[in-house]
Amino acid sequence: MTITDLVLILFIAALLAFAIYDQFIMPRRNGPTLLAIPLLRRGRIDSVIFVGLIVILIYNNVTNHGALITTWLLSALALMGFYIFWIRVPKIIFKQKGFFFANVWIEYSRIKAMNLSEDGVLVMQLEQRRLLIRVRNIDDLEKVYKLLVSTQ
């Protein structure tokens, strides 16, 4: 097994750990989930480039008669990338004392101001930064509003 294979195993393990955390661990942290809203995905061009480069590496490894384990590891990495970028749905998870946004816990007390932009983006102003929350379904913003009013 080469260093390349070890690095590929490390990247696959990191992506797998992220996927498990995102799907199974995060919804169970900090109490029961009150509301989970699917969000719009960010630009997919990055994911196309990533998976495309992995496919090029697989092709290059096969045509140069590279190690079979490397081909399988590259294929597993491409599948993990495909899952993370295209199948997994990003979401905001509301709990009793805060919410998870982009896998980061934010308490309700950190919210200084909230606005709704004209194009349906919920803007939350925190102490140091601004969160731009783009929901998939515009009707979900009413659910978020009702939840925030009831918890505050």
UniProtKB/Swiss-Prot annotation:
Q: Which InterPro entries match?
A: DUF986
Any one of the GO CC terms: plasma membrane
Top-level division of the source organism's lineage:
Bacteria
| Chain segments annotated as transmembrane | 6-26, 45-65, 67-87
Bilayer topology annotation: Multi-pass membrane protein
* Coiled-coil spans in chain: none
Q: Does the keyword Thylakoid apply?
A: no
Could you list this entry's UniProt keywords, alphabetically sorted: Cell inner membrane, Cell membrane, Membrane, Transmembrane, Transmembrane helix
User: Where does it reside?
Assistant: Cell inner membrane
Tell me the protein family, please: Belongs to the UPF0266 family.
Q: What is this protein called?
A: UPF0266 membrane protein YobD
Instruction: Please give the organism.
Output: Escherichia coli O1:K1 / APEC
Lineage here is: Bacteria, Pseudomonadati, Pseudomonadota, Gammaproteobacteria, Enterobacterales
Gene it is expressed from: yobD
